[in-house]
Each structure stands twice: as structure tokens, then as C-alpha cells.
Amino acid sequence: QTQIIDPEFLYLIIESFVQYESKKTNSTETALKNAITNSILSYRNTFLNKFDARFVLSKMQDFIDNVDTNAIIGSEVTVRVQRRFEPKLNESASYTIKFNVPIIRGTLLNKLSSTQFTVFDVGGTLREAQFEEIPQSFTGISEIQVTNPGAGFTTTPTVTISGDGSNATAEAVIVNGKIQSINIINRGIDYTRATISITGGNGYGAEAVVVIDGKSGTLRTIYFDSLAQRQVINSNAGKINYETGEITINNIRFITVDSNDGLIRLTSQAEKGIIQSVRNTIITIDETDPTAISTTLTSV
């Protein structure tokens, strides 16, 4: 019996910057842009839109550069990945969104963001909001995961965090002689790697691993007030795993969604120029989305 697999779509947002010599082409700027758009869609039709596909940035750039080999000098392309999900309206729920590809840790000007929706703020006022990644200029400890709770603890053991950063501290929570969790007291700064040791407390066998900010990030919900100033609704609306591209959205109640199809779009820059589809994922470029393909031409 044939098994029918429902696909999940990973959408690519393509932003190309193309240098060309205007004296070497009879095409207008508009015509050249349209030809570049068609070349990108031709790449999609040839290599994407199917299971077990692979996006290769350098090959797509060849399609762009070959639009007019006489006039086009070269191109640079930024690729963002986008996942879409349908929220439950007027109902509190949490969500897990899987890009299934590594994504770049955001900066102040380039970070994960979303399309708009409405939620109530803590004061009960309805706000037109969006998700955004909190840019962080340092790497602290974001989480400590207990991998073995151990046994026999009668007092709180000492938790020591070692690594190339400084000032991170944590405290164990003991329940029935075992370590139930380890709470972070001070996240510390400048860590790229860290280990943890658990000593004392009369117990034995407890083990834990440290997760640093380089591998994870935080989502917040924000809105812009009448003066166009950013206001934070929830500073801990979710988590980002940069290595796996998994987004966890904490419990939230959406009221409305600002899109005709009822979907919220999460967009982030891809970490690598080669993107392999996994499981039931189809990589595609949505030509009906006006933001999917943009081209900036520079004449030299």
C-alpha cells in the first residue's frame, strides 16, 4: 500500500545584489530584474519543490550570473529561511516550529522576526505585536540540563561551572535525595564552552550539561507605540536552538493574525549556503509572496 506523506514547506527568501555594466546590455533595469527573478524561479523548478532536494547557493548564483554573461559582473545573495504555522485563536497554547536547518544567531540589525498578530498585553490592552529575537552581545549560560539526578543527597551540593567565560553560578534543587533541577543564579559572560561539576551534599552520581547562549537564544513579543518606539510585551516568549533551527513558543493566546491565509511567518537567515531537505520537508520559493525575491542592481 502506497504511503501518502503530507509535506511541510521550508520557504526561502532570496535577496540578491547584482553588479552589472549598463553599457554592455540593451535591457532596462526593470527587464534585467525580471530576468533575474525568472532565473531564480527556474532554479527552484529545476532543483527544489520536491522531497530530498538540496539548495546550493553557489549554483543559484550561477543561474543569476548567466542571465546576461556579457553585462553582469557578479552577484551576492542573502538567503533567509521561513516557516509558517497556523495558530489557535482565542486559546492559550504553546508551539514548536522546526526549521530543520541551522540558523544564524541574530544581531541588532539582522535577527529572527515574524509577521504581525494581536495579543493582549499585561494591562489588558490589545496590541498589534510580533515575535523578535533578542540580540545578545555576549554568551552566558542559558540552561543547565540534569542528565543523571544521582541519589543520596541530604543537603544541597555545590555546583561549579568551569569554562572560558566568567561569573556563572547555579544552585541545585533536591527532591527526595535526587537533583530535580539546577537553577541558574548568574548567567555569566563570554562563554563559548563550559562544563559543570556537582560536589558535596552527601550524594553521588549526579551529572549535568551546560547549554550556552551560542547554541540558544530567546524570543520576545513586542509592539511599536504611537511614537514608533519598541515596547516589550513578553521578554521570554520562546526559545531558539540555532543548531537545529527549532523554535519553541511559550504559552500564548493569539487573538487575530495579520495575514489573509491565517498563518504566522517566522523568518531567519540561514547559517549555511547548502540546505538539505529532511524528512517530509519540501524546500521552495513562494513566487506569490512579494518579499520572496528581491534584487538590487548596481551599475558600474
Tell me what each language-model feature is.
Residues 16-22, 99-101, 268-270:
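Flexible glycine-/small-residue-rich
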Residues 133-218:
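Conserved, function-critical positions that sit in or immediately flank catalytic
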Residues 6-13, 53-62, 80-86:
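A glycine-rich phosphate-binding loop feature that marks nucleotide/adenosyl-phosphate handling sites
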